[in-house]
From Swiss-Prot:
AMP binds at A11, V12, N13, S26, C27, V53, G131, R133, T145, V146, S147. It holds the Pfam family Usp. PANTHER family: ADENINE NUCLEOTIDE ALPHA HYDROLASES-LIKE SUPERFAMILY PROTEIN (PTHR47710), UNIVERSAL STRESS PROTEIN A-LIKE PROTEIN (PTHR47710:SF2). This is Universal stress protein A-like protein. Gene3D superfamilies: HUPs. It comes from the Eukaryota. One of its GO terms (cellular component) is cytosol. GO terms for molecular function: AMP binding.
Length: 175
């Protein structure tokens, strides 16, 4: 009787530079690193769990003042946001299927650092992989880091994967 595959949760997000459906530099690097260095050709020994956490805008709109919004506008916006998240996940699911590694993907909404840790507790992966933008001390104070929070609070081992130096934009906060 075979053993269960090792479950690797990878947190993914959209690029702050290119937006949906493009993955951020750091999460794409973390995902690719996981496939290259951990999974390699042992695809049947692993299952990739892809989690995308969408941050909900306070009023539900990025560019439109909600005072002019109807209930239907809010419903349409939620459906549009979900569709964008699905397109992002599709990129990663397709990569998993190309190499033959099993995967599951889902979307949650909320504060990424909290939701990732809640999902780790719920799903119980063997370990979590997150990308890291490599922010400096000053930027960390104002921007904060999801990866540092997950290292401290997730109930499983956490691997943080830095971006390659040649992939870092002029503003490291961009991703």
């Amino acid at each position: 009787m075979g053993s269960e595959p090792t479950k690797v949760m990878v947190a993914v997000n959209a690029s702050t530079i290119k937006d949906y459906p493009n993955p951020s530099i750091s999460c794409k690097r973390a995902f690719e690193w996981t496939l290259e260095k951990i999974v390699r050709s042992n695809t049947s020994d692993f299952k990739i769990l892809l989690l995308h956490v969408q941050v909900v805008d306070e009023d539900g709109f990025d560019d439109v003042d909600s005072i002019y919004a109807s209930p239907e506008d809010f419903r349409d916006m939620r459906q549009s946001n979900k569709a964008k998240g699905l397109h992002l996940l599709e990129f990663f699911v397709n990569k998993c299927h190309e190499i033959g590694v099993g995967c599951e993907a889902w979307i949650k909404t909320g504060d990424p650092k909290d939701v990732i840790c809640q999902e780790v507790k719920r799903v119980r992966p063997d370990f979590l992989v997150v990308g890291s933008r490599g922010l400096g001390r000053f930027q960390k104070v104002f921007v904060g880091t999801v990866s540092a929070f997950c290292v401290k609070h997730a109930e499983c081992p956490v691997m943080t994967i830095k971006r390659n130096a040649d992939e870092t934009p002029s503003d490291p906060a961009d991703d």
